[in-house]
Amino acid sequence: MQHGSLITVEYQTVNYVSGPLIFVERPKEISFGETAQIILPDGEARTGQILDISEDIAVVQVFEGTRGIDSHVTTVRFTGQSPLLDVSYDMLGRVLDGVGRPRDGGPEIIPEARLDIAGMPINPYSRDKPAEFIQTGISAIDALNTLVRGQKLPIFSGAGLPANQLAAQIAKQAKVLGEGENFAVVFAAMGITYKEASFFMKEFEESGALERVVFFLNLADDPTIERIATPRCALTAAEFLAYTHNLHVLVILTDMTNYCDALREISTAREEIPGRRGYPGYMYTDLATIYERAGRIKGCTGSITQIPILTMPDDDITHPVPDLTGYITEGQIVLSRDLFRKGINPPIDALPCLSRLMNLGIGPGKTREDHRNVADQLYASYAYGRDLRRLVAIVGEEALSELDRNYLKFADHFEKRFISQGNVERSIETTLQVAWELFSLLPDEELKRIKEEYIDKYRTLIISGG
């Protein structure tokens, strides 16, 4: 992230320091969102941004943290510019810190452009409808909650669930079907541990996926305030790759709960009136400025698809972070602790999951003609099997009919064979084939959500071993 201008204004009127914020008295001719350099007595320079301005006070957030800042001898230099990020096609394959500085020991990014990390608002009329299928290689997503190019589809996880493994698997495997497609991944990690960072680096390097990944890494011991800039820097890089170099970019943001906690910390330091669970009342608007930067633009070949990942505290889907995220985004993938305890990997709970744009990315010429019918039948059969499990807990399995026992068996096989796949990548054809193999547990007359022509065509192939 860069700053600077030929004309700058300096102040030595720092009033006091509170958390990641400093308060500067009597500022003049400065603007909201402007960057600042904080110069310490030993010459160390830190980067900040104006959060709030009143007649007498400017509130500046310091990205590197405020430790060591003495309000009496610290100089603040306002630059007259918004925070900028150096962007280049050569960012692919690089590991950067939360504000875009090299973290891999490599050279500085030689910029093709310097862009405002806040992005530019997109005219709604210029947006194009998401339409193309993105294959993640994960059956529970590809078949039941299809990811469409230009969509924002979050993953709701719980503490200790393998969300990081799922994120790494998606980053390695995601592709747009068809030859000649330029595809890249921008991966932004916020507040993760060294162990988690090492896991991601190892996964990307061993698979060779690092060559097409831009990695923004903010560790748990990095300044909390830096997390506010990390997703915006990542999306700025994604917009440059998508709209300048015509790449189809998948942006993975993890963990958005850490981002929101940083937002709460800043709000507390500013002594704002808290909202639900202490989060600021403007958190919905703030999250929207991140999530709404996904999509496609008419006349542009490139696109941005988002997968935000967040941790639900106490597995509570009504917590403000998943709750507000669900309002803004176009569906959700929910990880289940019960499935995780059963050894199902990935532990995706199909029933509360949703992809609102799924129908735009499936069907003939995109996936396969029977995709919608197969997904509907899988949902219906699995939901009935889950209901029967609760009934069995009361009356016992002996009270069930033979057909009901088949549905129980279907639910078990659905979890163990369809949902659970470990690190194995499945094509959409393989995923649909596994689904048809599961349907062999049920008689034809129970496949009420599938057209007869598809039953005749695909069930015959399974029976014949085709």
UniProtKB/Swiss-Prot annotation:
Recorded coiled-coil stretches: none
Keyword Membrane in record: yes
Pfam family, one: ATP-synt_VA_C
An annotated GO BP: proton motive force-driven plasma membrane ATP synthesis
Gene Ontology terms for molecular function: ATP binding; proton-transporting ATP synthase activity, rotational mechanism
Subcellular location(s) per record: Cell membrane
Descriptive protein name: A-type ATP synthase subunit B 2
The species this protein was found in: Methanospirillum hungatei JF-1 (strain ATCC 27890 / DSM 864 / NBRC 100397 / JF-1)
